[in-house]
C-alpha cells in the first residue's frame, strides 16, 4: 500500500507537466527523421527508421527520447502536417513544445552497397550544435549502422557513459533489415489494411521482433480483433514501459474475449511492477467476472485515485453484491458527487434507496484509457523512486541490488540495459563478484572475447563461481584451447556438481576431442 500511494502521488504530480520531464530533466531528447540524401525514393523509409532505432537505444541507455507519437502530436498542435520537414528554427519550436532538452538531426547517403549516416545534437537551452558524428556500413547491416551511431551520440550526450559499442550493436543483432523495413512501413502507412500487411510480414520474417509485435497488437486491438491482439501483446519482450503497456492491453483484450482468468493474470503481472488504479481496477473486474469477491482490489484502486469516479462506482457495486448495503450506498453517493448526471447511477440509487430489486444487476466498469504516454510517465516515476532508494543503500548493497536487476535484464536478452546496470554496480563497488561475472556474460554475448575473459578472471579473483568458470570454458572451447576448457568446466562442476551447463560443455569437449561420451 505504501508503494501504491507513492506511485500514485508521483504520477499525479507528474501529470501537471510533460510526462518525461518529471524525472528526465536534461535527458529528454527529440530525435527527428533523417534527411534522405541518397536520391533513391525506395530508401525513403530509412527517413523514419533512423529515429526509431536511435530512440530505442537511447532509451535503453537511460535517456528519455520522445516517441514518434509525441512528435506527431506536437506537429498537429503547431498546425503542421505529419510529413513536415522542420528547419532548425521550427525544430526548436517543436522541441520547446515538447519540453525537450536536445534535438538530434541527421541524414543518410549511400555509395554502392554501403550507407553512411551522420547526426548532430542541438542543445535547446544553449542553442548550440555539436560536432557531426558518423557511422558507416553495408546497407544490409542498416540496423547495426544506426546502433553504432546511437552509441556515438550517447557518448556525445554523456562523455562518462561506459557501455561498450559492441553492446549497442548486439542490441539490434536479431533484427534483419527486411523485417525492419516492413515494420517501418507498417507504422507509417496511412491505410490500416496496408499497415497490417506490413506488420504481419515483419513478424513473419522475424518472430522475435518485439516492436513489430507491439505495433501489430495495437492495430488488432484498434480493430477489435481481441484474440489476435492478446496473442500479439504476449509476444512483446521490450523494455519495461513497453512490456507493462503490452501486459495491460493484453489484459483488456482477454477481458473483451471472455478469458477472465487469463485477464486476471495479465493485470496481476503489471500490478506487481505498476500498482496504479487502472491496473488494479481491471484486475478486480477480471476477478469479479469469474464470480469471485474483488472488493479488496476495488478498494485499493479507489485509494490510489480517490478522484476517479468509476472506482467509487465499482466499489459500490461490489459492496452491494457482497452484502454491505451501507458501504455501497456511501460509495455510490461519492460517485454521484463526481458524476451527478449519470443515469445508470441515478437508477441504482433510486432502487437501493427503495430497497427494491433491480431488473439488471450493474457490472463494474473497465478502465480503458491508460495510454502509452501514461505508461512511460509511470515507468519514469518508478525509476525515480528506485534511484532514490538505491542512493540510500550502502555501496555493497547498491552493487548487489543493481546486479540482481541487471541479471533479470540479461535473462530477457536486453544486453544494453543489463550492461548499463552492471557498470553502475561496479562503480558502486568494484569488488562485486556478481557484477564482474554478469558483465563477463554480457561481453561474451556481444562477441567481445577479450573483455569477457578479463571480467570473468576479475570475478574469479574476487570469488570463485561456476558461472565465471563456464564463461572461460566456452571462450577456450571456441578458441580450440581444449585442455584449458576442460579445466575450466571441471572447476565449474566442482563448485556446482548439478550444473547442467558444465556437463553440456564437458560433453561437447569430449566430442571435439574424439573421446567417448560419458
Q: PLM features: residue spans?
A:
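Alpha-helical segment of the N-proximal tetratricopeptide repeat
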Residues: 176-211, 215-224, 373-374, 397-424
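A structural "domain/chain start" motif
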Residues: 14-63, 71-72, 76, 175, ...
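Residue-level recognition of tetratricopeptide repeat
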Residues: 209, 243, 276-277, 308, ...
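Catalytic-center loop of serine/cysteine hydrolases
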Residues: 52-56, 69-187
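Canonical tetratricopeptide repeat
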Residues: 215, 249, 282-283, 314, ...
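Structural signature of tandem alpha-helical TPR/SEL1-like repeats
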Residues: 190-198, 222-235, 256-269, 289-300, ...
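TPR alpha-solenoid repeat register
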Residues: 212, 246, 279-280, 311, ...
